[in-house]
């Protein structure tokens, strides 16, 4: 329920049955930018009924992992949003893919943060939500979140690798990890198998953890640059910190 006095948006949930064409997305080698991602979603899911756009609000999120007294592995994450509409997206297991629960910031899909989502067109837009997770957990106990890094000095420069690997964008890489990874090492293997192209002209890194309590930070940096000179997103490579 919305509480405008407290600057809270609304929270929605959606259960996605079926594969939402992710296997086809992987088979085509992903995409290298948000425009091509929107085109894939339009061609396969929304079929041009609505106009899609993807933007990223300015955020400064944080996470931690911990072990509870009973031995459970915990993954915590906050969103430093002033206000947003959020959606919990439930997806089913499909032919070698895990079931998962993920969180989507509906601002990213162009949903008005100051309005409740009541119209049919807003609901059609939300069919794109499985491709825009900011964090989530799958049924193997793998959790993953995405966070802005603001790399590049005065102006943020997006990571945009340029090798012969297939291409994936920020949120679609997180979707791959949720659907296909059994543990942290498999998440790292997935991330290292693709060229990353950050979405919305900004830069990101990831935290991933699994049911054993193991965790890692995945970040893309230029070995020869410092924060203020890391201005060439094509020269960044994946670094993993356990």
Describe the role of every protein-language-model region.
Residues 201-242:
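Extended amphipathic alpha-helical segments with heptad-repeat/coiled-coil character used for oligomerization
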Residues 80, 192, 213:
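Residue-level marker of positions within ordered structural domains that often coincide
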Residues 94, 192, 206-210:
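A sequence-level detector of short, solvent-exposed, charge-rich linear segments
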Residues 189, 193-194, 202:
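Extracellular-facing segments of soluble proteins and assemblies that are Gly/Ser/Thr-biased and enriched
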Residues 1-185, 196-200:
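N-terminal mature-domain region immediately after signal-peptide cleavage
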